[in-house]
């Protein structure tokens, strides 16, 4: 027996020595790895400037906020059963703490802690409400106690003493409940005529026979001669560009103004805007704020498509109040655009001439028809 015990002790001693040797051989490797990693991290990190006291203070504040949120989550878990009780004010106190801490949150880590705390509070309230609905909801005694707490004149409850009488503030209770049960009681009257007769239904009309479509008619072809004609704006643009070719550099008010017609001044502005849009005219501003108009060659289409040339647009406000000071500012005789004659009188004359020709044609047709009728009567009489 002694020999066996000695043998076992020797075996256990050898095993323990081997384990210690192995552990001692492994520990320096771990230490070396840690040292290497530390040296690598130190070599990778650049030399950072010393942290200021304000940043250290901000980090400390953030840690304090996170610790407060952690304590608040533990508090929510501990008070899980008391949050939805009628007599308990823990829910209000916890939600006030969450709101106060939320005012201090500035960084994402604290925002995550704030969201987690609010989520824990919501989950605890939802679980407690579900448990109450599963067990039958609020009992009648709890409902009456809640009414007494809210609208009772004394602080006594039904559980305190059965013989005590509790007076209620029925008026306040009625005001709070009336918003949910608003029902208006009106008079039972009849709206509409006193004698109402049944309207007879109209008899249905059978489907009308549809006529077959006739033969296709080909419309007459009309020459587009009017489309080829230039509009008034194109003519004004051509006249204005020729004026700019002759004078090279002109003030905008001298070019646009028509002293006798505000409408033609607006038309000149319209023509100038098209020239600017096409790139054929350039508007510049000198040091005194005067606007000058100069002719230029329009850019090629490929330059516009490639983006090398870009158009700049602007909005100009011009009305009768602007036209009056412009006519005073420009001297008489310095207007460049000519006065265009209106075609209203000519159009009215042509229209009256056309109407006269139509009337004459109608009279001729009537006379010819009468003559034909007389001829037929004479023929019949002769026979």
Curated annotation (Swiss-Prot):
Biased composition (Basic residues): 201-212
Broad class of where this protein is predominantly found: nucleus
Distribution of this protein across tissues and organs: Not expressed in seedlings, rosette leaves and floral buds.
Ranges for region Disordered: 1-59, 198-231, 355-383
Localization per record: Nucleus
Cited Pfam families: Nse4_C
Keywords, comma-separated and alphabetical: DNA damage, DNA recombination, DNA repair, Nucleus
InterPro entries: Nse4/EID, Nse4_C
Biased composition (Basic and acidic residues): 1-22
GO cellular component, one term: nucleus
Amino acid composition bias (Polar residues), ranges on this chain: 355-372
GO terms under biological process: DNA recombination; DNA repair
General function of this protein: Component of the SMC5-SMC6 complex, that promotes sister chromatid alignment after DNA damage and facilitates double-stranded DNA breaks (DSBs) repair via homologous recombination between sister chromatids.
PANTHER family, per the entry: NON-STRUCTURAL MAINTENANCE OF CHROMOSOMES ELEMENT 4
Subunit structure: Interacts with SMC5, SMC6A or SMC6B. The SMC5-SMC6 complex is composed of the SMC5 and SMC6 heterodimer attached via their hinge domain and from the non-SMC subunit NSE4A or NSE4B.
Family: Belongs to the NSE4 family.
UniProt-recorded name of the protein: Non-structural maintenance of chromosomes element 4 homolog B
Lineage, broadest ranks: Eukaryota, Viridiplantae, Streptophyta, Embryophyta, Tracheophyta
Gene symbol of the encoding locus: NSE4B
